[in-house]
Curated annotation (Swiss-Prot):
Its main location: membrane. One of its GO terms (molecular function) is quinone binding. It is a peripheral membrane protein. The gene is nuoC. NDH-1 shuttles electrons from NADH, via FMN and iron-sulfur (Fe-S) centers, to quinones in the respiratory chain. The immediate electron acceptor for the enzyme in this species is believed to be ubiquinone. Couples the redox reaction to proton translocation (for every two electrons transferred, four hydrogen ions are translocated across the cytoplasmic membrane), and thus conserves the redox energy in a proton gradient. It catalyses: a quinone + NADH + 5 H(+)(in) = a quinol + NAD(+) + 4 H(+)(out). This is NADH-quinone oxidoreductase subunit C. It is found in: Cell inner membrane. HAMAP family: NDH1_NuoC. Belongs to the complex I 30 kDa subunit family. NDH-1 is composed of 14 different subunits. Subunits NuoB, C, D, E, F, and G constitute the peripheral sector of the complex. Pfam families: Complex1_30kDa (PF00329). InterPro entries: NADH_DH_suC, NADH_quin_OxRdtase_su_C/D-like, NADH_UbQ_OxRdtase_30kDa_su, NADH_UbQ_OxRdtase_CS.
Length: 227
């Protein structure tokens, strides 16, 4: 029995009432849970001997707003330009029938030498998730980053301030509906002799298509998915 198989077996037995989905792909184990079950799940994963996840190595937000969408209409093909190399496609390559936002945690057990991904989806109308900073100190800045970039609130965080964006920044730049060029630009005004903010004068446009494909490293190697 491999380490992942052992981990999956223990998760199915000990956390069956708290997780909604368990998957294993490309040598990685992922579980999903509801927001209200996050803290009970995380406490079990940290404190139970067979799990012993003593390190939170990453926490991030995800926005699935345009997940699976193509950048161009591809209903017709011509002999010139980008569309000449495009086959007819469906409206979406992939569909996610879940809330728009998710929070993803990556856990590591230095004692058991195994890893786990924990994911929970959050309703856009109620972007509040319990903080886990009291379980892993590394969560402090990770949660601040997710708040700054996605607008996800972490209930119980001791200092939930922006971490990366400028003072007075409006919006959350990693959201898919945030303009790539931003809302305002900062420049030095020679007449006023100070730095000012002004609306951006860049017109957003697509110059490189979004490519949706299966990673060719794993094509024809299905057996490795469940290692």
């Amino acid at each position: 029995m491999t380490k992942n198989e052992y981990l999956i077996e223990k998760l199915q037995v000990d956390l069956a009432n708290h997780i909604t989905e368990l998957t294993s792909a490309y040598g990685e184990v992922t579980i999903e849970c509801e927001v209200q079950n996050l803290l009970p799940v995380m406490i079990e994963l940290r404190d139970r001997e067979e799990f012993s996840f003593d390190e939170l190595i990453d926490l991030c937000g995800v926005d699935y707003l345009h997940y699976g969408d193509y950048d161009w209409e591809t209903e017709s093909a011509t002999e010139h330009g980008f569309s000449r190399g495009v086959e007819r496609q469906e409206a979406k390559a992939y569909a996610v029938n879940k809330p728009r936002f998710a929070v993803v945690y990556h856990l590591l057990s230095t004692k058991k030498n195994h890893r786990l991904r924990v994911k929970l989806f959050v309703e856009e109308s109620h972007l509040i998730v319990p903080s886990v900073h009291h379980l892993w100190k590394s969560a402090n800045w990770f949660e601040r980053e997710a708040y700054d970039l996605y607008g996800i609130l972490f209930d119980g965080h001791p200092d939930l301030r922006r971490l990366l964006t400028d003072y007075g920044f409006i919006g959350h730049p990693f959201r898919k509906d945030f303009p790539l060029s931003g809302e305002v630009e900062m420049r030095y005004d020679a007449k006023l002799q100070k730095v000012i903010y002004a609306p951006v004068d860049i017109v957003p446009r697509i110059v490189v298509p979004k490519v949706i494909r299966n990673d060719n490293r794993y094509i024809g190697n299905e057996g490795s998915k469940n290692d």
